[in-house]
């Protein structure tokens, strides 16, 4: 009821390293919200350590992307290839694994439930 109301969502700006994915608490518009999300979407794994992944429960669908480039500011945790990505973020039940080769880097994506 706090997060979704007729497809209206409250936006939150927070440091992901301070969030516990299995029991998120954050304040928005002066209201403390506690929620366990069904899905976790991280499209920039290369910008952070793996603690966000470790805090997720195995019943939360994880949709994540990373890349293999350390040539950009803030890329502190790139993966060298798709196999490195899968080892760093192991999934028990995988719905999708893929990569997209671009001129600047290769982008990796996984969707599934963690071990």
Identify the meaning behind each predicted range:
Residues 2-43:
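S-adenosyl-L-methionine
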Residues 5, 114-115:
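Secondary-structure boundary elements
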Residues 49-114:
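C-terminal substrate-binding/active-site "lid" region of AdoMet-derived donor-dependent transferases
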């Amino acid at each position: 009821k706090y997060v979704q109301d007729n497809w209206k969502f409250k936006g939150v700006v927070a440091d992901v390293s301070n969030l516990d994915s299995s029991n998120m608490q954050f304040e928005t518009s002066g209201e403390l919200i506690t929620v366990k999300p069904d899905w976790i979407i991280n499209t920039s794994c290369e910008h952070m350590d793996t603690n966000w992944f470790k805090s997720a429960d195995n019943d939360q669908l994880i949709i994540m992307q990373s890349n293999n480039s350390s040539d950009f500011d803030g890329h502190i945790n790139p993966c060298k290839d798709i196999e490195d990505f899968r080892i760093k973020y192991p999934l028990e039940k995988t719905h999708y694994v893929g990569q997209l080769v671009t001129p600047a880097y290769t982008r990796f994506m996984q969707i599934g439930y963690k071990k």
